[in-house]
């Protein structure tokens, strides 16, 4: 790692209690208005993140219809976002922004960076687990060994915690470092040093902690889209043998599963949009022109990343019918400005047994009907393969049928010499315009009405 500065005099970019990378000394001082704006923004985002994710955890834990294995990932994600808002947002960064420097010392800086890394990796890896669960429910509904249970979800969450800690704890053992960044009011990975140890840490962290979950997410949702296309064809086949009520329930179950998948896709998309600029800055600092990494260019991705913790409660309150119903029951004043779609709620109630059954590890009605349909199709195919048409009765068709020479047409038809040679005669029709025939006497001139002429 590049040695930090040893200047004695304290300036806007140097705090003697922490190690500051000398890269930040190249830029002009940051105006006070920027510090205060960052402090206000982080304070508001932190408070909203704490309250919003607290409501998510409370309602998902309290509401029975939301206590499914898949929603354990949602609770884990909300816990990560709440902790991220409470520790890496408000109040530490807010106070430091108003003080215009990191004031909590070196140990707090390392702890701040460590927890920020753990919670950040935990969020994206939890989203990867959500993608895997959605893929199993929608893309592989009849794979019994892949059904989610509370135990399986708990083990997956434990793995997420361990994986996140592994890729965050390196700087504690001098593999990389945690240092102030941007306008120097928060601490994160040292992405400016280019020594082999730091660069290897940045690359391993980038690919294993960031790119690998993104690849898993992309794979799962690509297969979900393909499965939905096939599912629509299967539903069209099922419509021929189901009555209207059964068909509506099956369609509602599929629609509810797709709604959950769409909510997950929205959450993952906003997370990637929030954290991708930060990843780009880290790679730019390692392999691109370092002078492009200004305090402002480094601070804006930090603000985007820290604001990602407030997106999930907003997405749930807008898109998740069951979550909205739980809010309306427990905190009705939170949705005074919103109205429920009655048809959407009715479809959600019809589909509840479908989604809950599939997520709890049971077999949904939709999956059972699909299995029944496939079994019937296999039975029909087996019957068709085993079917042998009976032999024709003896004496059929009778001998001599069709009569020879009658069908197909007898030889010599049409007769030779037909049409006769020289027909039509040469010079017919004659060349040139047809002869003009004079109008009979008493006829009106060309273009004049006959009745008007006679009158």
Curated annotation (Swiss-Prot):
Q: How is it modified after translation?
A: Contains one covalently linked retinal chromophore. Upon light absorption, the covalently bound 11-cis-retinal is converted to all-trans-retinal. After hydrolysis of the Schiff base and release of the covalently bound all-trans-retinal, active rhodopsin is regenerated by binding of a fresh molecule of 11-cis-retinal.
Q: What subcellular compartments does it reside in?
A: Cell projection, Rhabdomere membrane
Q: Where in this chain does the entry annotate a coiled-coil region? A: none
Segments on the Cytoplasmic face: 60-71, 133-152, 226-262, 317-455
Q: Which CDD domains match?
A: 7tmA_Opsin_Gq_invertebrates
Q: How does it sit in the membrane?
A: Multi-pass membrane protein
Q: Which family does it belong to?
A: Belongs to the G-protein coupled receptor 1 family. Opsin subfamily.
- Specify the protein name: Rhodopsin
Which species is this UniProt entry from? Enteroctopus dofleini (North Pacific giant octopus)
The gene it comes from is RHO
């Amino acid at each position: 790692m590049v040695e930090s500065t040893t200047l004695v005099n304290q300036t806007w970019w140097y705090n003697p209690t922490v190690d500051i990378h000398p890269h930040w000394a190249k830029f002009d001082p940051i105006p006070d208005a920027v510090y205060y704006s960052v402090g206000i923004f982080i304070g508001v985002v932190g408070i909203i993140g704490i309250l919003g994710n607290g409501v998510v955890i409370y309602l998902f834990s309290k509401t029975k219809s939301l206590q499914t294995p898949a929603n354990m990932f949602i609770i884990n994600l909300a816990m990560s976002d709440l902790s991220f808002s409470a520790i890496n947002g408000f109040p530490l960064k807010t106070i430091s922004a108003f003080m215009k420097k990191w004031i909590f010392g070196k140990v707090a800086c390392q702890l701040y960076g460590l927890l920020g890394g753990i919670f950040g990796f935990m969020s994206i890896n939890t989203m990867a687990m959500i993608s895997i669960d959605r893929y199993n429910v929608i893309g592989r509904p009849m794979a019994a060994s892949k059904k989610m249970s509370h135990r399986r979800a708990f083990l997956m969450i434990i793995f997420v915690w361990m994986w996140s800690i592994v890729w965050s704890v390196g700087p504690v053992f001098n593999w990389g470092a945690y240092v102030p960044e941007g306008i120097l009011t928060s601490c994160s990975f040292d992405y400016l040093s280019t020594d082999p140890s730091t660069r290897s840490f940045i690359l391993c962290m980038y690919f294993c902690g960031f790119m690998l979950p993104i690849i898993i997410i992309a794979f799962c949702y690509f297969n979900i889209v393909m499965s939905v296309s096939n599912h629509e064809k299967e539903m069209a086949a099922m419509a021929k043998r189901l009555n209207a009520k059964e068909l509506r329930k099956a369609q509602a179950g599929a629609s509810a599963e797709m709604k959950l998948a769409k909510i997950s896709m929205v959450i993952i998309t906003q997370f990637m949009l929030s954290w991708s600029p930060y990843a780009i800055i880290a790679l730019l600092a390692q392999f691109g022109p370092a002078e492009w990494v200004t305090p402002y260019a480094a601070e804006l991705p930090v603000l985007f990343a820290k604001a990602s913790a407030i997106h999930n409660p907003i997405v749930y309150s807008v898109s998740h019918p069951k979550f909205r119903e739980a809010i309306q029951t427990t905190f009705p004043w939170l949705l005074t400005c919103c109205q429920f779609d009655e048809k959407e709620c009715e479809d959600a109630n019809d589909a509840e047994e479908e989604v809950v059954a599939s997520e709890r590890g049971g077999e949904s009605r939709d999956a059972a009907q699909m299995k029944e349909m496939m079994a019937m199709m296999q039975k029909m195919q087996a019957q068709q393969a085993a079917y042998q048409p009976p032999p024709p009765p003896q004496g059929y068709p009778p001998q001599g049928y069709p009569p020879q020479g009658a069908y197909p047409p007898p030889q010599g038809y049409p007769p030779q010499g037909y049409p006769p040679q020289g027909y039509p005669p040469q010079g017919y029709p004659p060349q040139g315009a047809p002869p003009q025939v004079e109008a009979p006497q008493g006829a009106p001139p060309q273009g004049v009405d006959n009745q008007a002429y006679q009158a």
